[in-house]
Amino acid sequence: MAHYRQLGDVPPKRHTQHRTPEGGLYYEELMGEEGFSSDSSLLYHRGIPSAIVDARPWELPSQATTPNLPLIPRHLKLHQLFGEEWKGTDVVAGRRLVLGNSDVRISYVVAGAPSELYRNGLGDECVYVEDGEATVETVFGSLDVHRGDYVIIPRATTHRWVPTGEGPLRAYCIEANSHITPPKRYLSRFGQLLEHAPYCERDLRGPVGPLLVDGADVDVLVKHRGTNGVVGTRYTVPHHPFDVVGWDGCLYPYAFNVEDYEPITGRIHQPPPVHQVFEGNNFVICNFVPRKVDYHPLSIPVPYYHSNVDSDEVMFYCGGDYEARKGSGIGQGSISLHPGGHTHGPQPGAYERSIGVEFFDELAVMVDTFKPLELGEGGTASEDPGYAWTWSGGRGPGR
């Protein structure tokens, strides 16, 4: 984000002496994107931020994927993936991979326990809070998050998730191999959100703090690139990473609640790009929120049938009643995967039922990817095998 923030104790000039009350020096760390050519922040640590005293492999949950072959639309019931074990599960180690490709991985987790300290060395994360409450503690400070929040965590940000509600924390995790930003068309050339953007800087919540935590020989989990894909390392650092007395800059984690998204509507059906909220390399994130729908006298409010020949479409249904999917078995916590090369659209009867409807009370998060998605173990474990045949009245192989 080009939106500048300052928190805690920073010196008047960057790259100059910043002394402790005892006369020692704080250690300055520049955290920046694209080398030294994009957004960055300067953090001032009590300890040396590069110090480690141990490093060993961290065994990640399964990252294996299976091609979508034969090519069919799929329905994944994510709420089936977790039972009572959620109480001892955390948002980092408990993620189950649902879908992925070389640009983005989508996981789901239901958690009740605090995570270990963690940073993603591959790319930014966008975690959508389907339900529950948590505090996200980071080197930049803390964020209190709740249902409907998108939490954007920049690459290499050390943080941990601490559930704070009485019930489970349900998190839909989008992990990029790139940065996740507002769409370029929403931004001025200096990075300000423009008048036509469906949200603005006032809607974004930054960290508060700073956090100052004492500790010695603290473990930090790091997800990073390996020869055969995504791997993990467990560092032990000599002092707690939450030792930042102050920072300033334009790179930091932030939260944005889906209820603050202002939907763009029209007389006839508007295409998915008007619902876009973020973008990464070779994928976009959109949301479909409660809204007034098409008001042309002959409009058909549900989507027309379409073939997205260049992308796979993933819809995560997280609230309301999704009109176009009535009769498909899809409900809250469902994912639909409609792959490129396959025509998709409303279920039978939805076209006709939508005529005259003036308002859609629906909430869904969509990820469109420009490379084919494969199924992770969480995807294969939660699949509804009958979904592909629902446009044909249930007629399918062996039926």
Give short role names for the model-derived ranges.
Residues 1-399:
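Jelly-roll (double-stranded beta-helix
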